[in-house]
Amino acid sequence: MGRGKVQLKRIENKINRQVTFSKRRNGLLKKAHEISVLCDAEVAAIVFSPKGKLYEYATDSRMDKILERYERYSYAEKALISAESESEGNWCHEYRKLKAKIETIQKCHKHLMGEDLESLNLKELQQLEQQLESSLKHIISRKSHLMLESISELQKKERSLQEENKALQKELVERQKNVRGQQQVGQWDQTQVQAQAQAQPQAQTSSSSSSMLRDQQALLPPQNICYPPVMMGERNDAAAAAAVAAQGQVQLRIGGLPPWMLSHLNA
C-alpha cells in the first residue's frame, strides 16, 4: 500500500523541530541554487531560524540588486493600482484648480485693459500701476533695440549702395572716355576723307590751268627773236610781213587744238 498523505503541522519537540529545520533549509537553498543555474533565473531566498538566525541565498551573491528590483516592481504595481483608484477623485480637484486659475488670469487681463477696476483698493491699484509701468519700460526697451537694429541694417545697406554707386560712376566715366575717343577718331578720319576729296578737284584744276597756260604761251610769238636793222620803209614792210607770218602760225596752231580749248580761247 502507498504512503498516505502526511499532515503538515508544527513539530512540538524542539530537538526534532531543529533537525527538520536544518534538513529542509539545506534542501531549500540547494533547490534555489539549482533553479538559478539550470534556468538562468535570478533567485533570492531568505530564511530565519526559530532562534532568529539568518540564512540566505542569492544568484551571484547579488541580494541587494534582487531586492531592489523586487521593491521597484512591487511598489510600481501598488502605485499603479492606487493611482487608478485615486485618479477619479483627483480629476475633480484638478478641474477646480484649473478653473480658478483661468478665472484669475481673465480677471488680471481685464485689470490690465482698464476694466473692472471698481473691485480694487488703493494698494491693488498702485501695484497694477507699477506693473504697467514695468511692462511699458520693457516694451520701450524692446522697441528701441529693434529700432537700433533696423538703423544699423539700413546703414549697412546705404554703405553698400554708395559703394555700388561709386563703381557704376567709375564705369560710366570709363565708357564716356571710350566713346569720346571713338568720336575723335571718327572725326579725324572724316576730316582726312574731306581733305582728300577737296584736294583732288584742286589738283585737277591746277593741272588743267597749267596745261592751258602752256598752250597759250606756245601760241604767242617769241619775244626774244632778233631782227636785223632796217630802214624806215623797210621796217614797216618787215613788221607787216612778220605780223602776217605770226598770224598764220597762230591759225595753224589753233587748227590743231581741240574744240574745248578753242571755245576757251574765243571767250
Swiss-Prot record:
Gene Ontology MF terms in the entry: DNA-binding transcription factor activity, RNA polymerase II-specific; protein dimerization activity; RNA polymerase II cis-regulatory region sequence-specific DNA binding
**Pfam families assigned:** K-box, SRF-TF
Compartments where found: Nucleus
Entry GO CC: nucleus
Q: Which GO terms describe its biological process?
A: positive regulation of transcription by RNA polymerase II; regulation of transcription by RNA polymerase II
Provide the disulphide bond pattern. none
* Residues covered by the MADS-box domain: 1-61
Q: Could you tell me where the Low complexity compositional bias lies?
A: 182-215
This protein's source sits in the domain of life called: Eukaryota
Disordered: annotated span: 179-215
Q: Does the keyword Iron apply?
A: no
Where mainly located? Answer: nucleus
Keywords noted in UniProt: DNA-binding, Nucleus, Transcription, Transcription regulation
Q: Where is the K-box domain?
A: 88-178
Quaternary structure and interacting proteins, as annotated: May interact with the K-box of MADS1 and MADS6.
Role, per record: Probable transcription factor.
Protein name (database record): MADS-box transcription factor 15
